[in-house]
């Protein structure tokens, strides 16, 4: 299918990850499982090795549950399922099995945001934290850059369902999120106005009942001859302008990035670690 996979679970890495939002990674790290394949075709993808090239190995539901328990034994703050959409039925079975065997840390669903409501409804009761992208306000950008139609409508409807499930943000005593929603807005070079429209939409609808994560870490990993603006990083001025816009709106619950995070060293090696 579109995601380059069958229903058989395929993963590329299972390890502690320290570069998520502070309330997700904390000091112990997030127990991150990277799934192979993706339902988007972003031409600027930083994880192309696993999303497009489909690197990884097939594992059973039982093995996936064991990976979750192994990460918990390494003191992971949570189980972070990255690009999980196309394996949801199997993931739910693995969560059930892992919980029967002692899994008791939060489940993070780390998604592109391009989800069907039916899929999100399946996850009710299994996911504690939705860590979701909101990539585009302008659907033409979604078509051009990610090869999907109606990104805004699909993502906003899916987010509504996520909000119904986990609308009350909860944190542990040491500041780790245990339930809630973080919406990631990746700023693309020269497309700051699109990001502003997303922030405005989200704040008008949800106020500070969700957390925003406004990201400047876009990294041009290959030369793009079709969309030349993707060949540069986001300037400090562009990013500061968006942060000031969010502050002027009244946004209080948001993560921002300081300094230069647009570096390939922030991209994990996909080397089958932990499998």
Predicted segments, located by residue:
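Conserved Radical SAM active-site core
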Residues: 3-129, 138-139
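Hydrophobic faces of well-ordered beta-strands that scaffold small-molecule active sites
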Residues: 31, 79, 107-109, 130-132, ...
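Conserved radical SAM core fold
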Residues: 51, 88, 113-116, 134-152, ...
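A general structural detector for well-ordered alpha-helical segments in enzyme core domains, enriched
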Residues: 64-67, 91-95, 119, 123, ...
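Conserved glycine-rich "GG(E/T)P / GGGxP" loop and the immediately following alpha-helix
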Residues: 72-97, 144, 150, 160, ...
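Non-cysteine beta-strand/loop elements that form the S-adenosyl-L-methionine
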Residues: 124-139, 209-218
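Anionic-ligand binding region
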Residues: 143-174
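Auxiliary Fe-S-binding modules of radical SAM enzymes
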Residues: 167-275
């Amino acid at each position: 299918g579109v995601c380059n996979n069958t229903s058989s679970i395929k993963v590329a890495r299972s390890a502690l990850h320290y570069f998520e939002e502070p309330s997700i990674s904390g000091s112990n790290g997030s127990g991150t499982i990277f799934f192979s394949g993706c339902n988007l075709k972003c031409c600027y993808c930083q994880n192309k090795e696993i999303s497009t090239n489909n690197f990884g190995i097939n594992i059973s539901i039982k093995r996936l549950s064991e990976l979750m328990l192994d990460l918990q034994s390494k003191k992971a703050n949570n189980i972070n399922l990255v690009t999980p959409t196309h394996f949801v039925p199997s993931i739910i079975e693995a969560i059930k099995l892992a919980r029967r065997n002692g899994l008791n840390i939060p489940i993070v669903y780390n998604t592109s945001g391009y989800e069907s409501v039916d899929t999100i409804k399946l996850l009710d009761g299994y996911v504690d934290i939705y860590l979701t992208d909101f990539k585009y306000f302008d659907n033409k950008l979604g078509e051009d850059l990610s090869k999907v139609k109606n990104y805004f409508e699909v993502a906003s409807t899916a987010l509504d369902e996520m909000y119904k499930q986990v609308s009350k943000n909860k944190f542990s005593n040491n500041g780790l999120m245990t339930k809630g929603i973080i919406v990631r807005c990746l700023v693309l070079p020269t497309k700051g106005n699109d990001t502003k429209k997303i922030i405005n939409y989200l704040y008008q609808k949800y106020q500070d009942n969700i957390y925003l994560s406004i990201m400047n870490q876009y990294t041009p990993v290959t030369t793009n001859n079709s969309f030349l603006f993707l060949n540069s990083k986001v300037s400090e001025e562009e990013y500061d302008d968006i942060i000031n816009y969010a502050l002027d709106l009244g946004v209080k619950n948001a993560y921002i990035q300081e300094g230069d995070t647009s570096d390939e060293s922030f991209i994990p090696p996909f080397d089958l670690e932990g499998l």
